[in-house]
């Protein structure tokens, strides 16, 4: 399986602008810039896209883990908070924190925790990141 996305950047780092697109078309010339990345201006940035990908990947991985334990989730809601810091080697993604809440009928806390931990380590996006990944997982009734 392969997935494809592209980016075009025009101009210098601080005064330039770019667009990002995905082969599916869900991202189509979506703008980004220095200010959307480092100054909290409205718009997207690479780190936000990584966080979104991680939240989506983890949610699907958790669903797979639960299904493998004969548990069917009603809902899984995941947010990913990515931390990027300037280190001696330059800007580095140092951590991602996953906050997940799930409704899973018939699940007990132990089974849910096992599924969540397996999803955290087994999610393909988790595997590609070298950052510390922490998690708060809540089973809701």
What are these regions (language model features)?
Residues 1-52, 59-141:
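Extended beta-strand/beta-hairpin segments
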């Amino acid at each position: 399986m392969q997935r494809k996305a592209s980016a075009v950047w025009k101009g210098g780092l601080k005064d330039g602008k770019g667009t990002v697109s995905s082969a599916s078309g869900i991202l189509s010339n979506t703008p980004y810039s220095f200010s959307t990345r480092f100054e909290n201006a409205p718009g997207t940035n690479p780190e936000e896209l990584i966080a979104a990908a991680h939240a989506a990947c983890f949610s699907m991985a958790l669903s797979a883990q639960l299904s493998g334990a004969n548990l069917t989730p009603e809902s899984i809601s995941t947010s990913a908070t990515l931390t990027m810091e300037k280190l001696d080697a330059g800007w580095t993604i140092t951590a991602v924190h996953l906050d997940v809440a799930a409704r899973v009928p018939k699940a007990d806390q132990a089974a849910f925790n096992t599924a969540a931990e397996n999803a955290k380590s087994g999610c393909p996006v988790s595997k590609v990141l070298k950052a510390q990944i922490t998690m708060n997982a809540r089973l809701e009734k």
